Amino acid sequence: MAAMRKALPRRLVGLASLRAVSTSSMGTLPKRVKIVEVGPRDGLQNEKNIVSTPVKIKLIDMLSEAGLSVIETTSFVSPKWVPQMGDHTEVLKGIQKFPGINYPVLTPNLKGFEAAVAAGAKEVVIFGAASELFTKKNINCSIEESFQRFDAILKAAQSANISVRGYVSCALGCPYEGKISPAKVAEVTKKFYSMGCYEISLGDTIGVGTPGIMKDMLSAVMQEVPLAALAVHCHDTYGQALANTLMALQMGVSVVDSSVAGLGGCPYAQGASGNLATEDLVYMLEGLGIHTGVNLQKLLEAGNFICQALNRKTSSKVAQATCKL
């Protein structure tokens, strides 16, 4: 870690030069991007070995100290289905709640929502998909039936003054159906928005998307849902996560999901990369002169901490590069 602290300033000295490069040919980019850190939940949920509650709490606290304004904390799902998230209440109650930072939690059903609120949650997340077959295989119902389940959560959230964020899985491709129609993604996203989700994250669940596919999908969705309500969630399975994110930024999206150290593999492509690494995202955004509010040095330290705890190498290219110097 000490070597990384010394190496970082030299490694990142080129950022000033990068900021000086004109981005006029890239279209209008947002001046500020909100990063939604999903590592503690999406990144850890499929870990085979149970991560201790104190480690999860320390990771989230370190991410808060790094300046991330939204940190997806845990999932209020049955431990029978996701053992890794069995300590959801202890984690949510145990973390430091930094002023100005949101700590949303996943709630797949009304029972999970009620438990989350009882534990102090102020924002919850619900998951849908743009693929009928994916929905059927994952939650054993149709897309329309899934929205009937979400309706109970959204109504309860409205009564309790709880914000709800939606996810649309398979926005750029499905492991079962293959290509997904942009019109279908737009339809599902519009439904989430009309039901009360303040923000909808469009997920490339298996990482097959390319900038061209991203552009076509967003073009369709933006005709149905306000741009300010959209976010993107890219996986790096085919090495396209940053490229797809940049395309979304060029189209005006200013909310991006990512995971510290790139935690979270793709369950449909064994050995493949998973979530976009937050470190790599921050490095790119800073190079474009886009404000994130994130301290990259502290973020790297958080990534190093969790990788040591998991006894694995980081998937972040920025972390790998700075540690080699």
From Swiss-Prot:
Changing residue 204 to A: Reduced activity, and reduced affinity for metal cofactor and substrate. It is an enzyme of class 4 (lyase). The keyword Protein transport does not apply. Residues 1-27 form a transit peptide. It holds the Pfam family HMGL-like. A divalent metal cation binds at residues 42, 233, 235, 275. The modification N6-succinyllysine is found at residues 48, 137, 179. GO terms for biological process: ketone body biosynthetic process; L-leucine catabolic process; lipid metabolic process; mitochondrion organization. A motif (Microbody targeting signal) lies at residues 323-325. InterPro entries: Aldolase_TIM, HMG_CoA_lyase_AS, HMGL, PYR_CT. Changing residue 41 to Q: In HMGCLD; loss of activity and of proton exchange. One of its GO terms (cellular component) is cytosol. The active site is at 266. Keywords: Acetylation, Disease variant, Disulfide bond, Lipid metabolism, Lyase, Metal-binding, Mitochondrion, Peroxisome, Transit peptide. Highest expression in liver. Expressed in pancreas, kidney, intestine, testis, fibroblasts and lymphoblasts. Very low expression in brain and skeletal muscle. The relative expression of isoform 2 (at mRNA level) is highest in heart (30%), skeletal muscle (22%), and brain (14%). It catalyses: (3S)-3-hydroxy-3-methylglutaryl-CoA = acetoacetate + acetyl-CoA. Residues 33-300 form the Pyruvate carboxyltransferase domain. NCBIfam families: PRK05692.1. Homodimer; disulfide-linked. Can also form homotetramers. This is Hydroxymethylglutaryl-CoA lyase, mitochondrial. It comes from Homo sapiens (Human). The gene is HMGCL.
